[in-house]
């Protein structure tokens, strides 16, 4: 097919044949040139009598892979044999085989990712996630005291699974587990663990999730430091416990998880309470409560006894009698003061009466004096005679003396000298 035909747009009336499509794809892919690509090896297919070997290189975070084709001598001449799960960097050129319509990366160099480089990348990821706040204690979720059901993600038939289940059952025989077995190393570990984590997180019966694995090399534990897994754990609504390796092992998952356990056995102890210890604690609390109650009763009894010994309770009439005596004494004082006051006032009244009597008309009459009144003939009130003109001869008079009055008549008047 001419280049003019190849560059033209395909139509229902003029479609491209398969060979042309593959040719165009091959030309486009080959323009990419040589590339360095990082991933994890899987499905290494090497035959002694083959000149070419075929491998699968998987992405370390997502379920994405690419086929590798390389000379068998590159694999055979390596100082250490390649194995599934190895983290490597390959150098190759993308190739598209037009006849079969398949894509592969033609590899001419395979280099293992060094331990130092791996650790540096892990630390770089750790710093970046810490800066985002994924390690912040404030975002850590508290574990339930007694979980209804425990989710467990671990390798099938692994020692970690046996340790978690046996220790948990010994501590609390009624504990229930929801176990999902996944790959715990290699290229498929991260996507399988993430899928299991999401399934358990969506299960309403699961109250806490344990991700457990036994010890291993740095390469073996790499899945638990992959960013995709850290993001999934941070997004989970259910508390997650990291129980990876042994005490010295510190994958990034330990920092992101809500709780880090030193070992799978330690995880079981941290998640499931010990029924024997709880019973002992209950007995101790019961004893403390009883002792506290007895102490309170004893203190109240002592306080009541002290109150009973008070005089007011020993003889309730004592304060009443005391108040009665005080009232009687006050009444006596009041009576005495009133009597004295009355007598004083009586003496004063008698003295005033004597003074009034001495100055009054009766006293004057008693000394021989008399009061003469003229009685008018018109029947009006008598008038005291003070002049001779008031009693002409023939006037009727009344003379008041000390012991009575005398009726008389005026016989005549005489002017004073």
From Swiss-Prot:
Signal peptide feature range: none
InterPro entries per record: Exonuc_VII_L, Exonuc_VII_lsu_C, OB-fold_nuc-bd_dom
Pfam families: Exonuc_VII_L, tRNA_anti_2
Keyword Lipid metabolism appears in the UniProt entry: no
EC number: 3.1.11.6
Mitochondrion among keywords: no
Reactions catalysed: Exonucleolytic cleavage in either 5'- to 3'- or 3'- to 5'-direction to yield nucleoside 5'-phosphates
Sorted UniProt keywords: Cytoplasm, Exonuclease, Hydrolase, Nuclease
Gene Ontology CC entries for this record: cytoplasm; exodeoxyribonuclease VII complex
Main EC class the enzyme belongs to: hydrolase
Gene Ontology BP term (one): DNA catabolic process
Location(s), subcellular: Cytoplasm
Any one GO molecular function term: exodeoxyribonuclease VII activity
Main location, first listed in the record: cytoplasm
Record's subunit section: Heterooligomer composed of large and small subunits.
Function: Bidirectionally degrades single-stranded DNA into large acid-insoluble oligonucleotides, which are then degraded further into small acid-soluble oligonucleotides.
Record family assignment: Belongs to the XseA family.
Protein's name in the database: Exodeoxyribonuclease 7 large subunit
Lineage, broadest ranks: Bacteria, Bacillati, Actinomycetota, Actinomycetes, Mycobacteriales
């Amino acid at each position: 097919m001419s280049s003019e035909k190849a560059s033209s747009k395909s139509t229902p009336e003029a479609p491209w044949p398969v060979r042309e499509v593959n040719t165009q794809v091959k030309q486009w892919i080959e323009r990419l040139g040589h590339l360095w690509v990082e991933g994890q090896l899987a499905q290494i297919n090497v035959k002694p009598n083959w000149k070419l070997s075929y491998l699968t290189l998987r992405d370390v975070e997502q379920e994405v892979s690419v086929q590798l084709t390389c000379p068998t001598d590159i694999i055979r001449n390596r100082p250490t044999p390649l194995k599934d799960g190895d983290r490597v960097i390959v150098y190759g050129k993308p190739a598209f085989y037009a006849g079969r319509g398949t894509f592969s990366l033609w590899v001419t160099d395979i280099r293992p990712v060094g331990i130092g480089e791996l650790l540096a990348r892990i630390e770089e990821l750790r710093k970046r996630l810490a800066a985002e706040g994924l390690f912040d204690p404030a975002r850590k979720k508290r574990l339930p005291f007694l979980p209804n059901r425990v989710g467990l993600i671990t390798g099938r038939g692994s020692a970690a699974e046996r340790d978690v289940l046996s220790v948990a059952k010994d501590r609390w025989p009624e504990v229930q587990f929801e176990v999902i077995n996944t790959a715990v190393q290699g290229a498929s570990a991260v996507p399988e663990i993430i899928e299991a984590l999401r399934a358990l997180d969506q299960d309403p019966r699961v109250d806490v999730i344990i991700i457990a694995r036994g010890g291993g090399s740095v390469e073996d534990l790499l899945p638990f430091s992959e960013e995709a897994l850290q993001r999934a754990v941070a997004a989970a609504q259910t508390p997650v416990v990291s129980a990876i390796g042994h005490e010295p092992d510190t994958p990034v998952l330990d920092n992101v998880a809500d709780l880090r356990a030193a070992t799978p056995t330690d995880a079981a102890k941290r998640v499931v309470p010990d029924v024997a210890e709880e019973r002992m604690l209950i007995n101790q609390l019961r004893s403390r409560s009883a002792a506290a109650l007895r102490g309170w009763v004893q203190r109240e009894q002592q306080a009541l006894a002290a109150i009973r010994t008070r005089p007011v309770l020993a003889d309730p009439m004592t304060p009443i009698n005391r108040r009665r005596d005080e009232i009687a004494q006050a009444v006596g004082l009041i009576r005495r003061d009133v009597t004295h006051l009355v007598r004083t006032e009586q003496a004063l009244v008698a003295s005033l009466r004597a003074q009034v009597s001495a100055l009054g008309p009766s006293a004057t009459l008693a000394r021989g004096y008399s009061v003469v009144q003229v009685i008018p003939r018109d029947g009006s009130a008598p008038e005291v005679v003070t002049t001779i003109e008031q009693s002409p001869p023939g006037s009727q008079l009344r003379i008041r003396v000390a012991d009575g009055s005398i009726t008389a008549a005026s016989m005549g008047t005489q002017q004073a000298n």
